[in-house]
């Protein structure tokens, strides 16, 4: 690769393209002489829409095809929603950059007949659409009277299903709705005492081939230090729990002065068990904070909960 060319691998979904176009534009602004092209493609997760994500298996469900392009020398970088990027990357690839995080909250989206309701006032039997086991487990814990139904497809397809009456409400990532221009559909941001967000939610992760210093230098434009530290703690927490993108593990992080605060959660799929705690430490110890919190939750039964989930997924 020469310094005058950069090829970006991306999923071709509408949200992925919005995110990748933003990355391209920011890099182009910082490096006006760089010729940047986008190679868009469908991933396994984009193609299989009639099966719940958790039943497909989650190792690189939305990333493998993009990674193959880089390993074959057809692209220099790949843009991911960081929450979709596994914590263990293929040999030869690294996480080169994490962008500034947008709101990582989960959001409640309702149809016309439920405009009068908040999540806590939805009537018994209301149908809640979500494809996330993390959201499912936490909401079952707090609202066992609601009915949860899997929902797949892109954001527009999901909104159409909601508005047609197939669901009473949806739980979606606030950042995705905002990036797609649907901020007006956010009816309620779900408080973190109800739903901790996914690891990396709201941030973009840019993956690249290891050893490519010229590429890393180009990506420095987009690196956001505090987001990176927060996500480092979150990803080490997830890695230590041996969890993936489709497990009921949630987090919340913040940085106050030089102190990093990580809150983590593991829940059973039936919503009957939920283990949650907080760990604090120096920002420079972000990775260790994640590991320590994971081990604390394991000591309180999180490992057994996850093993039950992994067993049921393999069955």
Curated annotation (Swiss-Prot):
Pathway: Porphyrin-containing compound metabolism; protoporphyrin-IX biosynthesis; coproporphyrinogen-III from 5-aminolevulinate: step 2/4; Porphyrin-containing compound metabolism; chlorophyll biosynthesis. The keyword Transferase applies. It catalyses: 4 porphobilinogen + H2O = hydroxymethylbilane + 4 NH4(+). The keyword Cell cycle does not apply. It comes from the Bacteria. NCBIfam families: hemC. Gene3D superfamilies: Periplasmic binding protein-like II, Porphobilinogen deaminase, C-terminal domain. Its cofactor is dipyrromethane. This is Porphobilinogen deaminase. CDD domains: PBP2_HuPBGD_like. InterPro entries: HemC, Porphobilin_deaminase_cofac_BS, Porphobilin_deaminase_N, Porphobilinogen_deaminase_C, Porphobilinogen_deaminase_C_sf. One of its GO terms (biological process) is protoporphyrinogen IX biosynthetic process.
